[in-house]
């Protein structure tokens, strides 16, 4: 047989084997599904009524934080609502106060510490609401009010779960803490004060569970199942002041000069935005997002996602163009917030959101070279970065197990949160930080976050309470 024919046969065999490998991976993927068609545990009408009453009281309090303390009376009313509606917690837990940011502590039977978190401040009621934002209304089986999603329902569920366990005489397997900030929405000092207290006491947490992710619909193209999005990391925040100063002096009319600080700063901003500085990459949590959803996708998409390693380069080049949300998960982003000054001296604040801090530092060096070209000075003014957790941990597996038991119809997936949470302050005192609450949101609910007509369905309240109970009690199985 001629050598050429042998070579062609070998090439065809290799191509055939490769294609077979791709197809087999796609065909096998559905067998890796963890969701089940079995129904969720049924709700209890009496519990729904009790839980609704408490949450109505909580969301009626206008806990909008500002430096003038405009709503101090509303905050005080909110704390009284908690004291009255969670009697076992009030009686048996240790309560710490940090100028409005509160912390409950319940002693357990081991040295392990578990921290549950949800802030209690809310954003103002801007826009045209169908019902008053702070006069809770029940409509079509849902409670409409500011804070129902972000994040008084999760806070209610955490408090109620612990309150009911305490009332039953349950002996906690670990030390349980519940922390709630009064000024998270403005990136305030509430949780940093609690963090300082943890450091002072030498406390370290096996798990910190904050808000951030939820149960959502249509997370991936072609995926019909709902997804429980558990953030194991959030993008870091770095602020830099970029300043340009006029190098030559002269009267604009009598002795004009070409140098102009505004023009140089504008040229600097333009080049930073147009340059390909920020490296695109799949971090483990973003890769985990795609791999987890692959078994649930239609065949063509499943063919690609089930062979993620092979198609990674192609996906990097395409995905960022498809969705701004996905693009934000793949690289550092920069936002120039303002320009202040005049032709003699002007400045801008550059806001960087990074995936990994070490990558940002390399990218900043590239930006400094551009800054030098335009004689712009860069000064870092703020750094806020939390070490990533992993979705391949005991803590994540425990949460996934709870979700599989209580929400068998839902995919549990890691992801990268592009927003921010209070949990970012606790990276040095936690073994694992997860950002998730079991609030089940349809597309309208998701769109109502920080928007008009925010609402939560009453049937979801008992599920949330049971979730936090299970998170606590499953530590017995460790």
Positions of PLM-derived features:
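Feature marks short, highly hydrophobic, charge-poor N-terminal signal-anchor/signal peptide-like helices
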Residues: 1-12
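An extended, acidic, His-containing surface patch that forms the Zn2+-binding/catalytic region
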Residues: 95-96, 108, 216-218, 278-344, ...
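A common structural junction motif
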Residues: 121, 272-277, 368-376
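Short, solvent-exposed loop/turn segments at the edges of secondary structure
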Residues: 131, 173, 204, 224-225, ...
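Acidic/histidine-rich catalytic neighborhood of metal-dependent amide-processing enzymes
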Residues: 143, 149-229
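A short core secondary-structure module
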Residues: 192-197, 252-277
